[in-house]
């Protein structure tokens, strides 16, 4: 009973706030191609994805975040600035009551998750639902620019500086592998034998690295296959994505080793060229997609082209951690702090 009353009170408060908060707004296009009306200036944001939080941090607008998911809260080492923010539950199944109580201007969600219930529950409260995946390397620049456009001119300038930095490193990586023989590759998501296809961040990464991805004909972002399917295609390299994220080096190493062993021990996989040549690689999903995909691109290129002088993924990650693009932002901003 108390829970129902609490939800009702939050609903009334949010609807009252929405009624009186009518003012300027901007219209942006989300990842579904929809026109979304956003009240401006945006002061309060709930993000249902960790990649959304990372993008907002790049823009230096962490001050706008008022709620995050339980998953993001568990990653305190990666997101210390937001660890104390309220949890709104799981990214795919958020707590609408908590969101209503937080009264955000905008909730940032994936393209298709959660489902339409998100709009049905929140839009009547005056909460805009902005669906931006912010994961796929090919779409990330446009999506980040959309997000920056609602967070203000400084966020937009920092976003442009960030992509200048990404472009410089991408050019160096691609120059380093130019002319190298292209290996064949298959990439697997978290679920065993769930193969990454066109449109997925992991597939995009292999394409950016210039590999010949043997799943280019499946026509969908991911497909469940069996071992026979992989054995028939017989890739020279096999990439397995894993979710680490705890930032405990010893634990991450243990889990990476376990993951590699589980792949190598699959029935008949000793027949694969990738296994014979010790070319099975485990890639942390945090650097395989989202705003840090550049690090994953460098790591993947180094694996696929061992004879090339590929820029160090570690160095790129260090620059990312130190916001190395900020001098470009200040330069573009006329040197102002």
PLM region spans:
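Short helix-initiation/N-cap motifs at beta->coil->alpha
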Residues: 31-33, 86-97, 113, 218-227
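A short, structured surface patch at a secondary-structure boundary
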Residues: 44-102, 106-112
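Boundary at the C-terminal end of the N-terminal hydrophobic targeting segment
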Residues: 19-23
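Extracytoplasmic substrate-binding proteins
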Residues: 25, 35, 106, 116-194, ...
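Positively charged n-region of N-terminal signal peptides that target proteins for export
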Residues: 1-6
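Bacterial N-terminal signal peptides
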Residues: 7-16
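His/Asp/Glu-enriched short active-site or ligand-binding loop at hydrolase and phosphoryl-transfer sites
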Residues: 196-222, 242, 281
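Short helices/loops that flank or line small-molecule/ion binding pockets
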Residues: 95-103, 125, 225-234
